């Protein structure tokens, strides 16, 4: 469960904002995949939209079970898992899982091409890189061992996505911190956990702090897909979730 870490100094509140599906938004933008970009920017639910495409059904016919399968495919692509792992995760046969992945790659052809470009570029240079130029060297790509090479290819595909998302949250942290100081507020950024930021705010500042955190997170990087941050205010971290 979540920590009930409380904040009771001078009746302070915790303001918590987290990115909505940042890695998939980064993927759509970096891959310049118009189908996925349009789905995000139209406000559609990306997992339902993916399910409709992969299973060949209209969105209104997508059941929670189909949506959750599509969600596993979406994140499976980001984390570079293959048909075998996907099959285990969602309880289908390897053959069916492979069909889902193939159908996904057919739907989001920009993503498929991008993944291949990332592998080729990493083989060429010896490293994978984020949108901001941070590198991860991949000697595994030149290994004679097949398992090591496969690992290197997986990292070459997903490090640019996960790494860029990690870069963006760090940029957001700097922006939030600067803005709170610039507006002479007492609120302070106290914690970053994965894709969320937590600010401790005096009660009177909480609403404004929430507005600042979400604004700065959403403007941390200018990409083809708009970033979205959802925030809440609470007495404890648990409440603010």
Place the predicted regions along the sequence by residue.
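Short active-site loop/helix that positions an aromatic residue
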Residues: 20-32
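C-terminal structured "cap/appendage" subdomains that terminate the fold
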Residues: 176-230
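Hydrophobic (often cysteine-bearing) scaffold residues that line and stabilize catalytic clefts
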Residues: 2, 23, 43, 47, ...
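Conserved nucleotide-binding/hydrolysis micro-motifs of P-loop NTPases
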Residues: 20-22, 196, 236-238
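Short hydrophobic beta-strand that contains or immediately precedes a catalytic carboxylate
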Residues: 14-18
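Single conserved hydrophobic/aromatic residue that forms the stacking wall/gate
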Residues: 1-6, 10
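Cytochrome P450 catalytic domain signature, combining two hallmark sequence patches
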Residues: 31-41
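Conserved catalytic core of nucleic-acid polymerases
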Residues: 52-185, 191-192, 202, 232-241
């Amino acid at each position: 469960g979540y920590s009930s870490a409380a904040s009771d100094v001078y009746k302070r509140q915790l303001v918590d904002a987290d990115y909505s599906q940042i890695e998939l938004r980064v993927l759509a933008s970096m891959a310049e995949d118009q189908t996925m970009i349009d789905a995000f920017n139209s406000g559609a639910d990306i997992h339902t939209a993916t399910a409709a495409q992969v299973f060949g059904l209209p969105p209104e016919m997508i059941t929670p079970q189909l949506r959750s399968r599509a969600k596993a495919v979406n994140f499976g692509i980001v984390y570079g898992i293959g048909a075998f792992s996907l099959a285990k995760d969602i309880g289908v046969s390897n053959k069916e899982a492979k069909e889902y992945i193939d159908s996904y790659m057919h739907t989001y052809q920009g993503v498929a091409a991008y993944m291949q470009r990332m592998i080729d570029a990493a083989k060429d240079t010896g490293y994978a890189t984020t949108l901001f130029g941070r590198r991860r060297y991949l000697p595994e790509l030149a290994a004679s061992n097949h398992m090591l090479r496969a690992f290197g290819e997986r990292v070459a595909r997903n490090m640019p996505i996960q790494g860029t998302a990690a870069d963006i949250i760090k940029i957001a942290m700097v922006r939030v911190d600067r803005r709170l100081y610039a507006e002479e507020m007492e609120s302070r950024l106290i914690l970053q956990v994965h894709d969320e930021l937590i600010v401790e705010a005096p009660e009177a500042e909480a609403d404004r702090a929430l507005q600042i955190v979400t604004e700065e997170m959403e403007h941390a990087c200018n990409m083809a897909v708009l970033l979205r941050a959802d925030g809440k205010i609470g007495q404890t971290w648990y409440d603010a979730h």
